[in-house]
Amino acid sequence: MLTLIDPNDERQAFPPPDAALKEPNGLLAVGGSLSVARLERAYRRGIFPWYGEGDPILWWSPDPRLVLFPEKLRISRSLRKTLRRRLFRFSFDRAFRAVITACAERREKSEGTWLTADMQSAYLAFHHAGFAHSFEAWQDGALVGGLYGVAMGRIFYGESMFHRVTDASKAALAFAVGCLSHWGYRMIDCQVYSSHLVSLGASTIPRSEFQALVSEYSETSVDPEAWKHAPGDFL
């Protein structure tokens, strides 16, 4: 039975993740809002919103869960060659709005978008609150790839990525994983199975194991100053 989240009750707790439906896989709750407080409460439990235009807000905790441990990142020979050629320059938190807009445009062209205007506004507010972050790849001064997600505890919850030229999103991910690992993040959540992400080293784990890691990695936080270190500079 789905839990209905009252949009007027910011203190209402989410149900335990293991109460999620088996079909559709991981659907946990419906309703509520996309306020900063609500999003923070969700991500601290490993829960994320995902819904289409015209649908109510849906909250998910799928089983199994796709994750990428930084040390497991797999860089192909061709991508390694691309990185050695220095075709891209990288930054983080330099163009969050542009990254999320590009992610929405990509999905809209291919499969319809879940990144509605409300979702984009919510994550932009989450970014201003210091929780959501972006990584960017640039070429000749143009934004050609990137990704965004949510940093909570020692977990980075990846949300979406895009590319406009070959290998730009993969290169941005490699840069992001390097930064996140250096700063002390222990796990990158990739939500649901993707053959593309599996080829880069991601793997599925049972929800019970994922939730145990959420609890463990939420006990300590990465120094927020890490995200303030040269935040608009190219690296």
Curated annotation (Swiss-Prot):
It catalyses: N-terminal L-lysyl-[protein] + L-leucyl-tRNA(Leu) = N-terminal L-leucyl-L-lysyl-[protein] + tRNA(Leu) + H(+); N-terminal L-arginyl-[protein] + L-leucyl-tRNA(Leu) = N-terminal L-leucyl-L-arginyl-[protein] + tRNA(Leu) + H(+); L-phenylalanyl-tRNA(Phe) + an N-terminal L-alpha-aminoacyl-[protein] = an N-terminal L-phenylalanyl-L-alpha-aminoacyl-[protein] + tRNA(Phe). One of its GO terms (biological process) is protein catabolic process. This is Leucyl/phenylalanyl-tRNA--protein transferase. GO terms for cellular component: cytoplasm. Belongs to the L/F-transferase family. Transmembrane segments: none annotated. Disulfide bonds: none annotated. Functions in the N-end rule pathway of protein degradation where it conjugates Leu, Phe and, less efficiently, Met from aminoacyl-tRNAs to the N-termini of proteins containing an N-terminal arginine or lysine. It is found in: Cytoplasm. Its EC number is 2.3.2.6. Keywords: Acyltransferase, Cytoplasm, Transferase. Signal peptide: none annotated. One of its GO terms (molecular function) is leucyl-tRNA--protein transferase activity. InterPro entries: Acyl_CoA_acyltransferase (IPR016181), Leu/Phe-tRNA_Trfase (IPR004616), Leu/Phe-tRNA_Trfase_C (IPR042203), Leu/Phe-tRNA_Trfase_N (IPR042221). The gene is aat.
